[in-house]
Amino acid sequence: EYLRAGLRVGLATGAPGSLDFLDLFTEMRVELLIQRALNNRDFISAQTLLEMGTLSAAKVLGIEDKVGSLEVGKQADIIAIDFAGAHQTSANDPIFTLLSSASNSDIMMTMVDGDVLFERGQWHVDSTDVARNIGRVLSIRNALRPDQD
């Protein structure tokens, strides 16, 4: 309904109160299944769901000039997926295959702003930087929600 009304709709993780996982692939797969379970004839396509989890999500956040799609001048935020897993379904549509069967465990490589942070099971990050960033995020969160622990 929101899409038909022309509203910006993005998908993201971060609300485990509604779904108890932080896996965008699972979020998109659940959306596909809900649409079909409701027998919605106009269910959202896999292509639309992928866009909702990437460019549309960036638009909702107002950061589409930096992320959300691969374009010159934007951050190179990329993941590479291993489609060889036994749980991967065979389909002619790679986007549908991605959304219907991939999970975080299929991610072979993660690149953020052009830097490879994770590749083939190995993290390429400085633990001191990670701890510093976690502290920064927690202090921002605490400033925004001082009554929360």
PLM region spans:
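His/Asp/Glu-enriched, well-ordered alpha-helical/loop segment
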Residues: 2-85, 101-102
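Active-site microenvironment of metallo-dependent hydrolases
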Residues: 51-149
